[in-house]
Amino acid sequence: MLERCKLKILKGACGRVKLYIILVVIPAIVISFFVYEKEKDTIAAEHKQEASVLLNLHRNKINYLIGETMARMTSLSIAIDRPVDIKKMQSILEKTFDSEPRFSGLYFLNAKGDVTASTTELKTKVNLADRSFFIKAKETKKTVISDSYSSRITGQPIFTICVPVLDSKRNVTDYLVAAIQIDYLKNLINLLSPDVYIEVVNQDGKMIFASGQASHAEDQKPVSGYLDDISWNMKVYPNPVTIEELSKSLVLPLSCIIVLLNILFILVLYYLLKRQTQLERSENEAQKLELIGTLAASTAHEIRNPLTGISGFIQLLQKKYKGEEDQLYFSIIEQEIKRINQIVSEFLVLGKPTAEKWELNSLQDIIGEIMPIIYSEGNLYNVEVELQYLTEQPLLVKCTKDHIKQVILNVAKNGLESMPEGGKLTISLGALDKKAIIKVVDNGEGISQEMLDHIFLPFVTSKEKGTGLGLVVCKRIVLMYGGSIHIESEVRRGTEVTITLPVSAS
């Protein structure tokens, strides 16, 4: 019933569409989702790695620019002659300014903060004593780098490097101030990375400048790092994953997934169709066997009654006609009647195998009772018969004794008949996992694979005078007792028949 339910989906185009959706469409969607997420994460990780490389590149560039400017201003402050020649200082500042586009202006301040020399033309007197960088440089006597601010001289956004000029007693006499354009840093970064959004913020989180793309995703986390000499934090935002990138990376894996799922669908469909064919064939064979069994049982009863009468009349005639020739004919008639009775008995088992009463019987006793018959038959065929008991434990089976005898005798007789020129027949009895195992092995002619595939079908036989019902009846009996029968054979090598029966507790 379960197999039928499973195979209903194969009926009609609708069923196959459902199967295709179950095996291909749904798995493809689920797998594609995970592949999509994985590829997206992979590309995002690559972008983050690229952002880290750019961060190090730009940070090192700005660190070098600031460090090189500090070194230049420090060297200039040391090289200043005393007393200071303002015109000469003006000339030095202008030459330095003209050689570097980074500067917004270079200034020389006296101790009071007045601008005494400048690269920018001053219309009025300018004093920078109120600037925080001037105050700090005056207090610490060390180079100070300011935060960004708007220049009161040029109006440009700048940051300054203020270097105090010390005399021999380490007193501050003057100051060198280099104003660096914020736009220069922005253009420098934008030139190298125009497609990447980069922010530079101070320690308070105030934006100094931004370059690259105009915006970034709100949930996008930047790669960041502080500059060495100034408390600015540079943030590089990885580029978002684009549809074009995902499309290129997903074409191959998704194509492979779809191809593999379609192959799986074809294989499953083939398997289910094969199972459906086998199921239909099994149902047909079962129906045929049931029909044959019903017909055989009813026919057997009809045949057995007149056979009994014929047998009785033959016995009367045997007593009346004592002639040697007459007795010969009577014996032949009796043999044929016995053969007909045997066939009728097989018909009855085939039709109603459950009619007998089941009892607990020892397999050792059953085999022991039929071995004289098998030994006798073996002598007729010039075959050596060997019996092996592989266990000393009594093997009790709930069954009808005659049925088990019939199975073993039938299988043994088949083995003997397969060795017309002599050979060896081995019958063994053993136990495994609460099951009795009976093996009948011969080294006769063997059975072809084609015949083995149909060996348990009614009326299939390789014998000239066989009915083709013997093994059918044997299998019916064994299955009736919850056992199994299996045949392995190789042409010109022999045959092994294995019968398993469930063992009952004593």
UniProtKB/Swiss-Prot annotation:
Inducing or repressing factors: Expressed during growth and early stationary phase.
A matching Pfam family: dCache_1
GO molecular function list: ATP binding; phosphorelay sensor kinase activity
Keyword Cell membrane tagged: yes
Catalytic activity: ATP + protein L-histidine = ADP + protein N-phospho-L-histidine
Membrane topology category: Multi-pass membrane protein
Gene deletion effect: Cells lacking this gene sporulate normally in spo0F mutants.
UniProt-annotated location(s): Cell membrane
Keywords: ATP-binding, Cell membrane, Kinase, Membrane, Nucleotide-binding, Phosphoprotein, Sporulation, Transferase, Transmembrane, Transmembrane helix, Two-component regulatory system
Record CDD domains: HATPase, HisKA, PDC1_DGC_like
Record GO cellular component, one term: plasma membrane
Function noted in UniProt: Phosphorylates the sporulation-regulatory protein spo0F and, to a minor extent, is responsible for heterogeneous expression of spo0A during logarithmical growth. Also phosphorylates spo0A under biofilm growth conditions.
Name of the molecule in the record: Sporulation kinase D
Originating species: Bacillus subtilis (strain 168)
